[in-house]
A protein has these predicted regions:
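Thiotemplate assembly-line natural product biosynthesis machinery
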Residues: 1-19, 72-74
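Phosphopantetheine carrier-protein modules
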Residues: 13-32, 48-60
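Generic leucine side-chain signal with a strong bias for well-ordered alpha-helical environments
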Residues: 3, 14, 31, 36-38, ...
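Generic structural marker for isolated residues within well-ordered, non-membrane alpha-helices
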Residues: 7, 24, 42
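Residue-level recognition of oxygen-bearing side chains
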Residues: 26, 36, 63-66
Length: 74
């Protein structure tokens, strides 16, 4: 359920196809996201999951699965 929501948010923020995403999908390499795209996605994630994701944590979040692991450990 969480993974599906993350994929939906990423698809909306990055203009990507949710059906082509897996936990291994890289935001930058596979989806062509730039810093602004990632910023928008993180803001949407924070709002949806009611968490704060500090900027320093973002360097460890490169894939859909990274987001899921991060949110599960919050």
């Amino acid at each position: 359920k969480m993974l599906e929501k993350i994929k939906e948010i990423a698809a909306d923020s990055l203009g990507a196809d949710v059906n082509e995403m897996t936990p291994e999908t890289s935001f930058k390499e596979d989806l062509g996201a730039d810093s602004l795209d990632l910023f928008e996605m993180v803001m949407a994630l924070e709002e949806d999951f009611e968490v704060e994701i500090p900027t320093e944590d973002l360097e460890n979040i490169r894939t859909i699965g990274d987001v899921e692991n991060y949110l599960q450990n919050r």
